[in-house]
Curated annotation (Swiss-Prot):
Pathway: Cofactor biosynthesis; NAD(+) biosynthesis; NAD(+) from deamido-NAD(+) (ammonia route): step 1/1. It comes from Staphylococcus saprophyticus subsp. saprophyticus (strain ATCC 15305 / DSM 20229 / NCIMB 8711 / NCTC 7292 / S-41). The keyword Magnesium applies. Its EC number is 6.3.1.5. The gene is nadE. It is an enzyme of class 6 (ligase). Mg(2+) binds at D53, E164. This is NH(3)-dependent NAD(+) synthetase. Deamido-NAD(+) binds at R139, K172, D179, H259, K260. SUPFAM superfamilies: Adenine nucleotide alpha hydrolases-like.
Length: 273
């Protein structure tokens, strides 16, 4: 294992393997402890896309909230559907919600807000690319979640896990923004492992991962956008050897997107010593 890989593995907290029962218990307890340590928290809010990550985070949140209620805490889990117009995999969103059984479901169509924002920018002489429009969608979704959390006296739960974090495969202040990130420390295959343990419908964690933010490239697979497979990313994070090409791609993503993993720099934190 190279020096940089060793640094990355330690930073990303991924273990070579996880035991499903204890790992699930550890994440649920983390969520419960956070809520119980902040008396103002009355809800957990999370956007549900129908993919692996939000399905897992949603299930763990609902399980944690169920236990909190049993302990006498006033708390609820709010699942948010955030389509941009018609969502191509809307059926899988419904399947995820049926599996999660959230306390409350809220639906907000982000299309009017995103389109108006893009039009206003265009009128100001700022013409966004399709990729940049995708980031607008991600940020609008997170804005909505924070609005709901504020109204419901709660916090926003993120779906960021270590295979996304290491590559910076998320929108800064979009899906990368949240109050807690309970999946951090897991890689992609470990997330699948926990969903299998929690008896999730197989098609929700075996579907091809996609951010699906670009109109010109609908359902673009994550692995195609990243230029490397999740299997290689997972192997790298578990401290295993990967091809020199995959290693270079992963480490380039890690270095290039370091700013996404930091809070806003100040004159006291940049340049780093």
């Amino acid at each position: 294992m190279s020096n940089l890989q060793d640094i990355v593995v330690k930073e990303m907290k991924v273990k070579p393997s996880v035991e499903s029962k204890s790992e699930t218990r550890h994440i649920i307890q983390f969520i419960k402890n956070y809520v119980q340590s902040h008396s103002f928290i009355k809800s957990l809010t999370l956007g549900i896309s129908g993919g692996q990550d939000s399905t897992l985070a949603g299930k763990l949140c609902q399980l944690a909230v169920n236990e909190l209620k049993e302990d006498g805490n006033d708390c609820e889990f709010i699942a948010v559907k955030l389509p941009y117009g018609e969502q191509k995999d809307a059926a899988e969103v419904e399947d995820a919600l049926t599996y999660i059984q959230p306390d409350k479901i809220i639906t907000v169509n982000i299309k009017p807000a995103v389109d108006q924002s893009i039009q206003s920018l265009k009128e100001a002489g700022v013409n966004l690319t399709d990729f940049q429009k995708g980031n607008e969608k991600a940020r609008e979704r997170m804005k909505v979640q924070f609005s709901i959390a504020s109204k419901q006296k709660g916090i926003v739960v993120g779906t960021d896990h270590s295979a996304e974090n290491v590559t910076g495969f998320y929108t800064k202040y979009g899906d990368g923004a949240a109050d807690i990130a309970p999946l951090f420390g897991l890689n992609k295959r470990q997330g699948k492992q926990l969903l299998a343990y929690l008896a999730a419908p197989k098609h929700l964690y075996e579907k091809t991962p996609t951010a699906d933010l670009e109109d010109d490239k609908p359902q673009l697979p994550d692995e195609e956008a990243l230029g490397v497979s999740y299997d290689d990313i997972d192997d790298y994070l578990e401290g295993k050897s990967v091809s020199s090409e995959s290693k270079e791609i992963i480490e380039n993503h890690y270095i290039k997107n370091a700013h996404k993993r930091e809070l806003a720099y100040t004159r006291y934190t940049w340049p780093k010593n």
